[in-house]
Amino acid sequence: MQNNAPDDWEDDLNPWRVTGIRTPFSNAWLTIESSEVVHPDGKPGTYSVVRIRRLAVGVLPIDDEGYIHLVGQWRFPLGRYSWEMPEGGAEPGEDALDCARRELAEETGLRAAAYQKVLEMDL
């Protein structure tokens, strides 16, 4: 679908008004922005957003026999060991496919004969 909207159309439609932004936390992976806003109903408030700084890529490797290869590791935020698909963050300028190839090789030692994009989402 082609986007024929003028460059400023979102500004005209946005019912939120931002009166200030601060960054209470930032590291190599994410930034937290805290915005002072006026809600669409006119009430003031604070709206905080976590912005992911790097493209994240996951690979679900399925071999010729139908086996799925997962990697296991201790996840500090979960407080437990977790089995998961090979995944990681792209280096600056690295595209998703190159990142997927690199992460698969780094985490499993495997190389895929083919890749199929299944999902892309904004977090």
Where are these regions (language model features)?
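Acidic, metal-coordinating catalytic segment for phosphate/diphosphate chemistry
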Residues: 20-58, 63-64
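Acidic pyrophosphate-coordinating catalytic loop
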Residues: 23-27, 76, 121-123
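Conserved Nudix-box catalytic region and its N-terminal flanking loop in Nudix hydrolases
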Residues: 2-4, 8, 13-15, 50-53, ...
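A short coil-to-beta-strand element that immediately follows conserved catalytic motifs
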Residues: 17, 111-118
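Short helix-to-loop capping/linker segments positioned immediately adjacent to catalytic or ligand/cofactor-binding
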Residues: 107, 118-123
